[in-house]
Structures are given as C-alpha cells and as structure tokens.
C-alpha cells in the first residue's frame, strides 16, 4: 500500500460545526473509495503567502492516507476543486 499525505486549506470564517462536517465528509470520501485514513488532524490557522479568494488566513488540515490505487485520491481531488470551503489542497506521496 502506498502512503500519501493530503494537506488542504479551509476558509477561515467557516463555523466550527461546518468545519467538522467538512472534514468528516472528505475523510469518508477517502475511506468509501478504498483508502485507509491513518490520521486526520487540524494543523493550525496560518497566514497565507498571498490572498486566495480575498482571504489572508486559512485553517490547515492534514490527512495521512494509505491506498492501493489512485481512485480515492482522484475522487478527493475532484470534489475538493468543486467545494467552495476548501481554498487549496495538495496530495503528496510519502516515501
């Protein structure tokens, strides 16, 4: 199984309940498509290097995942591009 790290930035003005629901939804997208979520945690609220959609700060969230193939990662990638609460995301394969 390959190991991946996903980092995504959530808009800073989101309510706590909505943020928790968003994180749970995207964790379930990964697990429903065959990946195993090893760890999913909030990192911190950080200042962005440049404005993204008029925001200068963002809530960083890190997810460590194990997956056999790229199906779950592709679905995560597709849906995170559509979602307005996620400002940016990055998927990296861990050696």
From Swiss-Prot:
The lineage of its organism: Bacteria, Bacillati, Bacillota, Bacilli, Lactobacillales. CDD domains: bS6. InterPro entries: Ribosomal_bS6 (IPR000529), Ribosomal_bS6_sf (IPR035980), Ribosomal_S6_plastid/chlpt (IPR020814), Transl_elong_EF1B/ribsomal_bS6 (IPR014717). NCBIfam families: S6 (TIGR00166). One of its GO terms (cellular component) is ribonucleoprotein complex. Signal peptide: none annotated. This is Small ribosomal subunit protein bS6. Keywords: Ribonucleoprotein, Ribosomal protein, RNA-binding, rRNA-binding. GO terms for molecular function: small ribosomal subunit rRNA binding; structural constituent of ribosome. Belongs to the bacterial ribosomal protein bS6 family. The gene is rpsF. HAMAP family: Ribosomal_bS6 (MF_00360). Binds together with bS18 to 16S ribosomal RNA. One of its GO terms (biological process) is translation.
């Amino acid at each position: 199984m390959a190991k991946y790290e996903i980092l995504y930035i959530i808009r800073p003005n989101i309510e706590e309940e909505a943020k928790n629901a968003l994180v749970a939804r995207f964790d379930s997208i990964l697990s429903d498509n065959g990946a195993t979520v090893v760890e999913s945690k909030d990192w911190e609220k950080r200042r962005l290097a440049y404005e993204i959609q008029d925001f200068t700060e963002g809530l960083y969230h890190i997810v460590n995942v194990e997956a056999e193939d790229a199906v779950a990662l592709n679905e995560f990638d597709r849906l995170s591009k559509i979602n307005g609460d996620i400002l940016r995301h990055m998927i990296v394969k861990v050696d």
